[in-house]
Amino acid sequence: MKFLYDLFPVILFFIVYKLFGIYEATAAAIAATIAQIAWAKITTGKVDNALIMSGVIIVVFGGATLWLQDESFIKWKPTILYWVFTVGLLGSQWLFKRNLIRGLMEKQITMPDPIWSRLNLAWAIFFLLLGFLNLYVAYNYSTDLWVDFKLFGTMGLMFVFVIGQTLLLNKHITEQDKK
């Protein structure tokens, strides 16, 4: 259920785009993200840092799209978000000696430190490349195709990446974690 909750603004963007257009979809995504932040604050009393960052980026880039009536700003939004994730993953590990991927997953699985570092680096590289791929699609194909890619392409790539990581990491997960 959390997966659908997290994807709500993207799915709403896709639906509204198909029905009305890019500017209406951008406004809907901004509203949905603000609603998500408010809902998280009301129901749990806290808001996840990734959601706050996503909210700031959608308001800034979505707002610029609406204000200037230029869709290129909203097309940059996923790339900026992916690159912020890249900087966050690498910066936290290299500057603060804190592995964010490990922090998210270590309660579920146990692995040696070097494997956690490689996993963190793999995710950082994945987000970096996903940002470049988003720009490639945004500037070399139609807006219709970019919107489809934004939902289905990135979700598909994420799914394949997670499955690949799971298969590669399976040999490093302890027997206790597999039970």
Curated annotation (Swiss-Prot):
Keywords: Cell inner membrane, Cell membrane, Membrane, Transmembrane, Transmembrane helix. It is a multi-pass membrane protein. Pfam families: IspA. The chain crosses the membrane at residues 3-23, 49-69, 76-96, 119-139, 149-169. It comes from the Bacteria. GO terms for cellular component: plasma membrane. Plays a role in cell envelope biogenesis, maintenance of cell envelope integrity and membrane homeostasis. This is Inner membrane-spanning protein YciB. It comes from Methylobacillus flagellatus (strain ATCC 51484 / DSM 6875 / VKM B-1610 / KT).
